[in-house]
Amino acid sequence: MEDDAPVIYGLEFQARALTPQTAETDAIRFLVGTQSLKYDNQIHIIDFDDENNIINKNVLLHQVGEIWHISASPADKGVLATCYSKTSDSKVMTCAAVWRMPKELESGSHESPDDSSSNAQTLELLCHLDNTAHGNMAGVLWEPMGDGKKLISLADNHLLLWDLQESSSKAVLSNSAALEGKGQLKFTSGRWSPHHNCTQVATANDTAIRGWDIRTMSQIYCIESAHGQLVRDLDFNPNKQYYLASCGDDCKVKFWDTRNVSDPVKTLEEHSHWVWNVRYNHSHDQLVLTASSDSRVILSNMVSISSEPFGHLVDDEELSDQEDQHQEDKIKEPLQDSIIATYEEHEDSVYAVEWSSADPWLFASLSYDGRLVINRVPRALKYHILL
């Protein structure tokens, strides 16, 4: 069973920001933000045509500065948020803003990758997330499955909850919390949990992971030394409400049960340098992607701590006697965790990896040299999970 070859797209500039177009559930589309100090920065809208295995792209100008983080509205295909750096009074500030892409680009295009970006279009600024009182923005999180009206931004040691009003042209700060303690505390990343009615957020600062209840803006759990070095990224299991994955500069990926945070449930040590990203598959939570500055992307099958530790179980009525016996044998043995594949198409640090929001078997990864790679879960594993 031959697997499809990876598809590679090169941006002209360095890049570290990647997001699927979350509100798009039919077409496979990703947004990539560039980091250039010399030229106008860009957002590339990448459309993947999986029938022909080719990429089509559109380019939007993002003239305000180099993009450190990008996230797409869960409700409106045309809306996105960026964190970008700009220089003012010879100081570099990282700001955040909400943008709208031109209407005709929301649903992609059919321009081939070789067309020049001379016909790049500009983004419409909807609103700034005002951080003058709070410091540098590290990320913007949209309320999962929300109506695209609620956002959280992480600014230095502040967790800020925003309401977007008047067709997203105005961001009103509705609540905030601050990290307190010794030293210069700064959030590095965060994830908004899709569980508990979207009332919980997890954040990383230094080596610690904290859980917050955004109704009271109070801390609900804290994993003090979650990693030996800086925690880079977090993700929630979409099917198990208390399960959280983290990764960091200690080259490890850890899985936590937030009801008992004294020890991780499981630890992976497959990367040889900092791990920048960890992502659960949206449908099949045993599939976990990690990206690292060892220039590799690893796909792991964490089935023992997934929502289906015994694989895909079938109703008794659907089985013949012989199959019944086979099913009983299957039930007795939990499946083994394993590394499914290591993807080595990158030659530089891989700063981002994301699953498609339209196809659960497809993902994109982005390395700092501007190389975007689209890969798929191996077919044999896909059928093993489905059948």
Curated annotation (Swiss-Prot):
Q: What keywords appear on the UniProt entry?
A: Repeat, WD repeat
Q: Which InterPro entries match?
A: EIPR1, WD40/YVTN_repeat-like_dom_sf, WD40_repeat_CS, WD40_rpt
Pfam short name (any one) = WD40
Tell me which Gene Ontology terms the entry assigns under biological process. protein ubiquitination
The highest taxon in the source lineage is Eukaryota
Give the WD repeat ranges. Answer: 132-172, 182-222, 226-266, 270-310, 345-385
Please name every pair of cysteines joined by a disulfide bond in this record: none
Record-linked PANTHER family? EARP AND GARP COMPLEX-INTERACTING PROTEIN 1, WD-REPEAT PROTEIN
Q: Which family does it belong to?
A: Belongs to the WD repeat EIPR1 family.
Q: What is this protein called?
A: EARP-interacting protein homolog
Q: What organism does the UniProt record list as the source?
A: Gekko japonicus
Its gene?
A: eipr1
